[in-house]
């Protein structure tokens, strides 16, 4: 999402207040640049779904897919990244659907014009191959 949203100034992926401070600094160049703070995942996801924020097509996911992507981030990614000792149980039946939604979002975003310009042909092929491998793994 960050690559697809990032504009030439880099402020489009920042928290709103941070982006405002950065734009002001660009104008004045007084002092040190403000500390950059990336917008949270939910904000970036929302921004990527709005045409005004994207070059080319916005991210288009069904409401169920959007819910699954948010759940993957909130319930799985955050709990793994910010580990707190506790018991875990992962709903095996719903996990392939949730991962498919994330793969679909990734596939749509890597075809965005901004991302396309940033990736070499080799990287594009590797990403396409990895997404295909994951999809095939989900079907087996």
Annotated model-derived regions:
Residues 2-63, 83-86:
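Short non-catalytic regulatory patches outside canonical folded cores
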Residues 37-53, 64-71, 75, 79-140:
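Polyanionic, low-complexity intrinsically disordered segments
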């Amino acid at each position: 999402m960050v690559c697809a949203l990032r504009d030439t100034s880099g402020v489009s992926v920042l928290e709103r207040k941070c982006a405002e401070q950065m734009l002001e600094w660009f104008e004045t160049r007084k002092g040190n640049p403000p500390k950059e703070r990336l917008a949270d995942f939910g904000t970036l996801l929302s921004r990527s779904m709005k045409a005004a924020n994207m070059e080319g097509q916005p991210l288009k996911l069904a409401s169920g897919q959007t819910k699954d992507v948010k759940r993957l981030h909130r319930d799985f990614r955050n709990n793994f990244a910010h580990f707190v000792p506790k018991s875990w149980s992962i709903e095996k039946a719903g996990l392939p659907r949730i991962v498919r939604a994330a793969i679909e979002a990734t596939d749509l975003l890597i075809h965005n014009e901004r991302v396309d310009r940033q990736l070499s042909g080799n990287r594009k092929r590797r990403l396409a191959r990895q997404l295909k491998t994951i999809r095939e793994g989900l079907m087996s």
